[in-house]
């Protein structure tokens, strides 16, 4: 019989009053073997949208590429950026269409549009849930405990960045398949950008 192998990853998202913060740790693991400590699980789609994911790296990269291509095509045709919800619904349809051979990825979609900031949580089958904060992956239970304690409805982007890092550090310290450092994507009125936070590994 085949041995079950756990694919590790932890990602968090926080909706702030002035934007959205997404973050994920960088370790790529196969079971308890670390393949890399420089995996990218946070992707800027355009200057109003980003995603973070937990799951298999190849599936994350494929979904990010699909979203980038469709966001660009929409902008070229419609002469405006797609809304956060329209891109999330597109991703939902794509993921649900693969329900019999699903993408092994949970996704956080974060964006800002005319309606304000949005954080949308998606499972591998494309279910859509909008929330104020969320955590995905093997370290989600550890990370969400920090988010539960630290989140406020009036939290700012800068405060959300610090809270996201704290949540992921909690996961990295206790989840053996999370680690390597932290990537962040920040989406606010100034656009979307990525940042990196180095974390000392606990071995």
Swiss-Prot record:
One of its GO terms (cellular component) is cytosol. Residues 1-9 form a propeptide. One of its GO terms (biological process) is proteasome-mediated ubiquitin-dependent protein catabolic process. Gene3D superfamilies: Glutamine Phosphoribosylpyrophosphate, subunit 1, domain 1 (3.60.20.10). Pfam families: Proteasome (PF00227). The active site is at residue 10. It is an enzyme of class 3 (hydrolase). GO terms for molecular function: endopeptidase activity; threonine-type endopeptidase activity. Keywords: Autocatalytic cleavage, Cytoplasm, Hydrolase, Protease, Proteasome, Threonine protease, Zymogen. The keyword Coiled coil does not apply. It is found in: Cytoplasm. InterPro entries: Ntn_hydrolases_N (IPR029055), Pept_T1A_Psome_bsu_arc (IPR019983), Pept_T1A_subB (IPR000243), Proteasome_bsu_CS (IPR016050), Proteasome_sua/b (IPR001353), Proteasome_suB-type (IPR023333). The formation of the proteasomal ATPase PAN-20S proteasome complex, via the docking of the C-termini of PAN into the intersubunit pockets in the alpha-rings, triggers opening of the gate for substrate entry. Interconversion between the open-gate and close-gate conformations leads to a dynamic regulation of the 20S proteasome proteolysis activity. Belongs to the peptidase T1B family. The 20S proteasome core is composed of 14 alpha and 14 beta subunits that assemble into four stacked heptameric rings, resulting in a barrel-shaped structure. The two inner rings, each composed of seven catalytic beta subunits, are sandwiched by two outer rings, each composed of seven alpha subunits. The catalytic chamber with the active sites is on the inside of the barrel. Has a gated structure, the ends of the cylinder being occluded by the N-termini of the alpha-subunits. Is capped at one or both ends by the proteasome regulatory ATPase, PAN. This is Proteasome subunit beta 2. It comes from Pyrobaculum aerophilum (strain ATCC 51768 / DSM 7523 / JCM 9630 / CIP 104966 / NBRC 100827 / IM2). The gene is psmB2.
């Amino acid at each position: 019989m085949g041995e079950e192998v756990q694919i590790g990853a932890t990602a968090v998202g926080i909706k702030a009053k002035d934007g959205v913060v997404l973050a994920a740790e960088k370790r790529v693991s196969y079971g308890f073997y670390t393949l890399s400590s420089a995996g990218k699980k946070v992707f800027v789609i355009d200057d109003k949208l980003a995603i973070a994911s937990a799951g298999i790296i190849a599936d994350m990269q494929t979904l990010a590429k699909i979203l980038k291509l469709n966001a660009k095509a929409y902008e070229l045709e419609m002469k405006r950026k797609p809304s956060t919800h329209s891109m999330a619904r597109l991703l939902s349809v794509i993921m649900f269409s693969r329900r019999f051979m699903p993408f092994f990825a949970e996704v956080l979609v974060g964006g800002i549009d005319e309606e304000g900031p949005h954080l949308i949580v998606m499972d591998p089958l494309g279910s859509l849930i909008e929330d104020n904060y969320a955590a995905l992956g093997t370290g989600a239970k550890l990370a969400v405990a920090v988010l539960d304690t630290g989140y406020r409805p009036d939290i700012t982007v800068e405060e959300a960045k610090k809270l996201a890092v704290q949540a992921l550090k909690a996961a990295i310290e206790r989840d053996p398949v999370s680690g390597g450092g932290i990537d962040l994507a920040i989406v606010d009125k100034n656009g979307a950008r990525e940042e990196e936070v180095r974390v000392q590994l606990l071995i």
